[in-house]
Amino acid sequence: MPSNSASERSTTIPDRTPGELVVVTGMTGAGRSTAAKELEDLGYYVVDNLPPSLLRDVVRLVDETRGTAQPIAVVVDVRSGSFFQTLQANLAQGATGRHATLVFLEADDDVLVRRQEAARRPHPLQGGGRLIDGLVRERGVLADLRGDADLVIDTTGLNVHQLTDRIADAFGTPDTVRLKVTVISFGFKYGIPVDADFVADMRFLPNPHWIPELRPRTGRDAAVADYVMAQPAAAEFLDAYVPVLEGVASGYLREGKRFMTIAIGCTGGKHRSVAMTEEISRRLGEAGYETRSTHRDLGRE
């Protein structure tokens, strides 16, 4: 188990400069892939499962092809084995020519066991033994790296969103930390999405289902979308609702929230909600938010 004193290490990172190098390592199941994905979203060039002996070559290649200002993140795991000595030497000597930050992710053994079992994957060091045996070996192999880490994050009590927030707090800038908005369509007859922050009901709009030529189509088809958006009530709704969402989104960012889910429903989740989801996603994207639209119940009827 990680000690309390180490897991409470400050998460304050020294002032960052262009061309930073972040090295992510830590325990299997502690969230390395999640951290890497967030760093990629923050503009880092990410290399996963890199043998430390190739670190200088990767930095040189990125410098030559993308410029020295391109931040780089590399993920190194226990499968690199004895190469860890090379990594420590490179970081200690500044051999890459970049300011390097070493991030170590860990969690309590019982949490790591649950995560690995849920993923149905063996531990790379467990061999023919138990999963816990692999974790014990891994802690031993990584002990020195953990001691050298600039940032230790204990993910025992963190979910995916909370871990990405921690990474963004450490390595993001106002220009790179953006609110991620998901707009999801659904059918009320299948239930409201449980993770929705906002729910809007489109059943006040005329239903294309009752128009024979539109019935087999969906809200992603231009004919259906045009029909829905041509309704005066649809325009009134958008003009009133989207500014509210923009105001809330700005508040979310001020409060450190980085995810917002907006659910748009109609009877079956095929016509009205789908068209409105696409339009709201488009408008929020034009307002500068990172948006994606998804249609939970499309094709379910």
Curated annotation (Swiss-Prot):
InterPro entries: P-loop_NTPase, RapZ-like, RapZ-like_N, RapZ_C
GO molecular function, a single term: ATP binding
Binding positions (GTP): D77, V78, R79, S80
Residues annotated to bind ATP: G26, M27, T28, G29, A30, G31, R32, S33
Key words, A-Z: ATP-binding, GTP-binding, Nucleotide-binding
Key word Ribonucleoprotein present: no
SUPFAM superfamilies: P-loop containing nucleoside triphosphate hydrolases
HAMAP family: RapZ_like (MF_00636)
Family of this protein: Belongs to the RapZ-like family.
Function: Displays ATPase and GTPase activities.
PANTHER family per the UniProt record, alphabetical: RNASE ADAPTER PROTEIN RAPZ (PTHR30448:SF0)
Protein's recorded name: Nucleotide-binding protein Noca_2527
